[in-house]
Amino acid sequence: MIAAILFFYVMLPKKYERVIQEFSQEFGVDGDLVYAVVRTESNFRADAVSRRGAVGLMQIMPSTAEFICQTLGEKLDLNVPEDNLRMGIWYISYLEKKFDHTDAVLAAYNAGEGTVLGWIRNGYAGEKGELTDIPYQETKIYVRKVNFFYNCYKMLY
């Protein structure tokens, strides 16, 4: 039993804790959700770059980073871990204001805001805006994975 618990602590670290706590509080985002996104996106590898060009801990696309920097009025660098976290946490906060449900927020983080808005318009959401189906298999798996890690972080810490 103890070995299993230790395994989860090793698999679900709280790296960058000070920075994640600070920006999560600033932008009103659940820190455990941020850890789950970072764990899923990059496994806490600051130098991660996806085949599609997403960069850093939170795997932010350069075009999204540009939008975030313009909106915040700040000059931030995707390759600097603290800046990447600031952008990603702000972006989650932005998506939380657009969508009422965490699954929709996560789907938009993964597939894009416009894509999820299209799904909602095309009947993939219930009356309260919750996604009833996610047409992209990759995004469906992503949302499940982040939710799994999110629940694990909530239980462990």
Segments (PLM) and residue ranges:
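N-terminal Sec-pathway targeting helices
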Residues: 1-3
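Catalytic glycan-binding domains that act on GlcNAc-containing polysaccharides
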Residues: 6-157
